[in-house]
Amino acid sequence: MLSVKGLHAFYGRAHILQGVSLEARAGEVVALLGRNGAGKSTALKSIMGLVPAARGEVTFEGRRIERLLPYRIARLGLGYVPEERRIFTDLTVMENLEVGRQSARGDAPVWTEERLFALFPNLAGMRDRPGGRMSGGEQQMLTIARTLMGNPRCVLLDEPSEGLAPIIVEQMAHSIRTLKGEGLSVLLCEQNLHFSQAVADRAYIVEKGQIRFGGTMAELASDSSLREQYLSV
């Protein structure tokens, strides 16, 4: 589905990603874990073409995409939910969803407004509410829903649980598991290990722009020294 090999990326002269390699298979949830500043968000942005890849390969469904513009990558079926959310605060929930609408490709699930309201029931009663009058958790749900309106086959989620109330985090975890059940692949970057353990099949740990671990969540759970070295705050 999604394969990254030897990815290098820079911010100016700062060498942020230093040979990152990872993959997300069809229908799989993969967590990219690490401390703040480790390179997690940059990895997602580089996959989406928002931060140019200096070296390395990014392959999506058999096609090399590391030289494509972000809008071309999105049209191929790769969705991206940024940490900043970036909803249109003056537009209603329905209008925000309409902005993200694209036709489905191949056998990707077709997401309608009603299916999205079933996935995020909190949004169902807010159809005419402006995005600027929503809580942080509601805005996060709306951002994911808007991305799903593009009918992607793989979704990149940047810190989906950050700053959310515990009950909203639980709802977010349920929604991600539902996406997996629909056959979507999900690559999420997180600092919240507990949340990642609730949703992910496999994990990678990134530290100083390099992958330090790749394996199942069970393997990570059994290695306390690894968690202490790379994930403790």
What are these regions (language model features)?
Residues 12, 30, 53, 68, ...:
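ABC-type ATPase nucleotide-binding domains, specifically the catalytic core motifs of the NBD
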Residues 33-35:
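The feature captures the beta-strand-to-loop junction immediately N-terminal to the Walker
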Residues 48:
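Helix-to-loop junction immediately C-terminal to a conserved catalytic motif
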Residues 56-65, 76, 109-113, 215:
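Conserved ABC transporter NBD signature motif
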Residues 130-134:
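Conserved ABC ATPase signature
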Residues 147-148:
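ABC ATPase C-loop
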